[in-house]
């Protein structure tokens, strides 16, 4: 108690002295001089000391980097198992023990063998399979997990080996044995850069083969054409070892009964292609994609449970290819000799390459067939033909098909083509005729099947149906039994249910762009037909399957050329009397008028009608050789116009020659895109650094001001303008930026705005006010893979055709 009182008294005394010191600053105690405790107050930092400290830090970091690099070099080149016998022996013992342990585990658990085999596969096979195995393992059902490995994964691996053996033949392996061509054995695992390098090596090998053949065959200076053909045969034989058909092979190969002389002029272009690395790249890349897709089909990664019709990898590649094509079209334009320009994107969208135009033309053609059938009193039958079970890789439940014989998608298409050719030959021999259209589309595993809309005489319907059934089920007949429906299904079209056009409309739209099928659900895949259209398009492009084919009617290319001619005549003649003839021959003018009106039924009847041989058609497509040779020295064939056997000469519909050029770049936008280095870049170029406007003013400064002219003076000036002045005027007009159209803005409620913000957030976007305002004004946001997000009809949609 006494100690606490003394302590309290001492604290009060000390506190009072401190308060007095705080009141008078001269009474504060002085700090002891000790440079070791606080040297900063007595040694202020200078610029030199800071620089020395920075150098010291840099030296320490450099020393640490050198020590780390020295340790890495020591570990890699001096202290490793290849140079240290003791460490090498220890590493070998560790690997042997690990292998023994794994072998013991696999003997007691066969599932581990399957997982190990899956892990040994390439990444495009092992990664998706391991994800599925991991998912089944996470379910916690041991028996189902083991059954999945034994009944699904193991058969898939066995099928994969059979597919690889069928892809790589003995001759292909022989070619891969040459120096530098070992990559042919792993072609499906390569990317584009690797395939490009491999194609260069293959082209070099073909060049060496040609040099060796020339050295053996060309013994004298007077080389005969037959000796050149023998040298070509040697190079062609090497190309055929790679499962590639040489160019012009059918025309140049040896035949026992040749009716025409050998076209020796085709040998140089054929050799130029077989010695070109770009040509080999296209062939090898196509082969790589097909082989890779067939391997994915073998392991059940192409079906309605995984990816219908085609693999996701092929769909993504098709999207990227479409995106690059759109960028190319938007960056180029077409120009003629007069300086007139056309936007290349507008030209492509206005052509038959536009899916909407292609669909409309096909629907118009089918409608014309329907009208002709009504006029003739013919009946319409809808047929469905499917390949045998040995062509189907996957069952309907997504499991491997035990009857599959490693047949490819292309082989299934060839089977249907051969079957149809045999049936058509037998039908003509029996005196039966029909006309219509067929549509080729895939099953969920990619196997081809056909839908045919055929028109025929009512008295021939039973005979044609029975004959077609005979050819459709003649192979593997025992697997069908009494029910032939899975292979062949006929359906007589009932006018009460719908017209023939309505029957085929869904299949046409489904295989082009899925227009109008957003609410239609596929019975086979369970997905929307509009969403499946992208997969179907990628499937047809990858496997080179012709989706649509009309038969028994005149060609549609002449129809397109006639419509083009009618449009050109209307522009040239100006205001002419409605119905005035364009062609002198009234029969040809009637065909032209029918095509211009868009009536396929009238066009077909004016051409001669259905079931008429091609040699009796009035109007046909005319072709000619290109003026300029290709990169391989040959002149390709292009469309010239139309011609008719009842009239002399040809009519040209492509008189103006257009050249593809890159669009002019806006200098201000290009400089803004270059950033801070733009001024240096402009001043360091060797060419003229003036903007295009200044260059144009220097070269064409004597051009009059068009703005000050009235309408009559402007017409006279444009009429008397020379070619050089016209080009300069076109260049000036090209620099004028078009005025932006006033965009609209959609009005939505607050609830719809909140819903739009939530949907954007769910898709991975910020959902900010700027993004919502952009969508409401008709804009779009890129979402990856060439697709864009846009807001239309109070719905958030994703498409790559949002501009149309």
Swiss-Prot record:
Q: What is its EC number?
A: 3.1.-.-
Please report which protein family the annotation says this sequence is part of.
Belongs to the phage GPA family.
Q: Does the keyword Nuclease apply?
A: yes
Tell me if Nuclease is a UniProt keyword of this record: yes
Output the InterPro entries linked to this UniProt entry: Replication_gene_A-like (IPR008766)
User: Which UniProt key words apply to this protein?
Assistant: DNA replication, Endonuclease, Hydrolase, Nuclease
The residues responsible for catalysis, as annotated, are 503, 507
Source organism lineage? Bacteria, Pseudomonadati, Pseudomonadota, Gammaproteobacteria, Enterobacterales
Transmembrane stretches in the record are none
Q: What is this protein called?
A: Probable replication endonuclease from prophage-like region 2
What is the species of this protein? Answer: Salmonella typhi
- Entry function: Possible endonuclease which induces a single-strand cut and initiates DNA replication.
Q: Which GO terms describe its biological process?
A: DNA replication
Q: Name one GO molecular function term.
A: endonuclease activity
């Amino acid at each position: 108690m006494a100690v606490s009182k003394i302590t309290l008294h001492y604290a009060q005394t000390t506190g009072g002295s401190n308060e007095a010191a705080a009141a008078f600053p001269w009474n504060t105690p002085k700090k002891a001089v000790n440079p070791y405790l606080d040297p900063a107050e007595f040694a202020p930092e200078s610029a030199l000391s800071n620089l020395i400290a920075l150098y010291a830090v840099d030296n320490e970091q450099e020393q640490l980097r050198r020590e780390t690099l020295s340790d890495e070099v020591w570990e890699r080149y001096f202290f490793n198992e290849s140079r240290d016998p003791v460490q090498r022996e220890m590493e070998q013992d560790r690997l042997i023990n690990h292998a023994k342990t794994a072998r013991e585990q696999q003997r007691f658990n066969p599932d581990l063998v399957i997982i190990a085999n899956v892990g040994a596969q390439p990444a495009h096979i092992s990664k998706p399979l391991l994800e599925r195995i991991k998912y089944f393992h996470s379910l916690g059902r041991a028996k189902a997990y083991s059954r999945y490995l034994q009944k699904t994964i193991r058969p898939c691996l066995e099928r994969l080996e059979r597919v690889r053996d069928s892809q790589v033949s003995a001759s292909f392996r022989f070619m891969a044995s040459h120096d530098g061509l070992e990559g042919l054995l792993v072609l499906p695992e390569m990317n584009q850069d690797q395939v490009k390098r491999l194609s260069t090596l293959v082209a070099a090998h073909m060049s060496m083969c040609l040099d060796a053949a020339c050295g053996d065959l060309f013994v004298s200076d007077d080389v005969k054409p037959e000796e050149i053909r023998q040298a070509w045969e040697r190079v062609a034989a090497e190309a055929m070892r790679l499962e590639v058909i040489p160019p012009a092979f059918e025309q140049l190969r040896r035949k026992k009964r040749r009716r025409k002389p050998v076209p020796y002029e085709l040998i140089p272009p054929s050799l130029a292609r077989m010695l070109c690395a770009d040509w080999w790249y296209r062939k090898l890349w196509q082969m790589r994609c097909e082989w890779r897709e067939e391997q994915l089909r073998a392991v059940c990664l192409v079906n309605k449970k995984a990816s219908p019709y085609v693999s996701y990898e092929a769909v993504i590649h098709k999207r990227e290819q479409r995106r690059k094509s759109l960028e190319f079209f938007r960056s180029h334009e077409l120009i003629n000799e007069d300086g007139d320009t056309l936007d290349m994107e507008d030209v492509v969208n206005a052509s038959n390459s536009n899916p909407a135009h292609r669909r409309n033309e096909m629907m118009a053609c089918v409608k014309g067939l329907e009208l002709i059938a009504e006029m003739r009193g013919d009946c319409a039958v809808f047929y469905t033909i499917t390949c045998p079970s040995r062509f189907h890789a996957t069952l309907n439940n997504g499991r491997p098909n035990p009857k599959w014989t490693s047949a490819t998608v292309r082989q299934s298409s060839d089977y249907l083509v051969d079957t149809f050719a045999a049936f058509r030959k037998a039908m003509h021999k029996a005196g039966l005729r029909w006309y219509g259209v067929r549509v080729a589309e895939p099953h969920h595993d990619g196997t081809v099947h056909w839908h045919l809309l055929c028109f025929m005489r009512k008295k021939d319907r039973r005979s044609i149906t029975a004959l077609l059934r005979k050819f459709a089920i003649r192979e593997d007949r025992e697997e069908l039994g009494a029910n032939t429906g899975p292979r062949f299904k006929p359906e007589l079209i009932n006018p009460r249910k719908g017209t023939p056009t309505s029957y085929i409309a869904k299949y046409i739209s489904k295989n082009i762009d899925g227009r109008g099928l957003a609410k239609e659900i596929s019975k086979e895949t369970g997905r929307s037909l509009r969403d499946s259209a992208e997969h179907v398009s990628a499937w047809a492009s990858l496997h080179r399957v012709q989706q649509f084919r009309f038969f028994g009617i005149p060609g549609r290319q002449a129809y397109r050329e006639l419509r083009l001619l009618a449009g050109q005549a209307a522009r040239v003649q100006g205001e002419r009397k409605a119905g005035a003839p364009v062609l002198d021959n009234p029969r040809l003018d009637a065909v032209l008028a029918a095509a211009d009106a868009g009536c396929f039924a009238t066009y077909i009847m004016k051409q001669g009608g259905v079931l008429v041989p091609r040699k009796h058609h009035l109007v046909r497509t005319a072709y000619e050789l290109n003026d300029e040779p290709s990169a391989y020295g040959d002149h390709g064939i292009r469309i010239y116009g139309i011609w008719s056997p009842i009239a002399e000469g040809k009519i040209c519909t492509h008189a103006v020659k257009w050249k593809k050029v890159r669009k002019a770049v806006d200098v201000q936008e290009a400089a803004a895109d270059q950033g801070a280095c733009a001024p240096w870049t402009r001043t360091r170029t060797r060419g003229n650094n003036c903007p295009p406007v200044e260059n144009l003013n220097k070269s064409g400064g004597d051009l009059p001001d068009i703005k000050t002219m009235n309408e009559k003076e402007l017409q006279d000036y444009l009429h008397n303008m020379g070619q050089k002045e016209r080009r300069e005027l076109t260049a000036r007009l090209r620099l004028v930026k078009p005025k932006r159209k006033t965009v609209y803005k959609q009005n939505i409620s607050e609830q719809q705005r909140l819903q739009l913000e939530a949907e954007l957030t769910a898709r991975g976007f910020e959902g900010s006010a700027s993004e919502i305002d952009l969508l409401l004004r008709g804009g779009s946001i890129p979402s990856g893979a060439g697709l864009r997000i846009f807001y239309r009809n109070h719905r958030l949609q994703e498409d790559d055709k949002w501009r149309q």
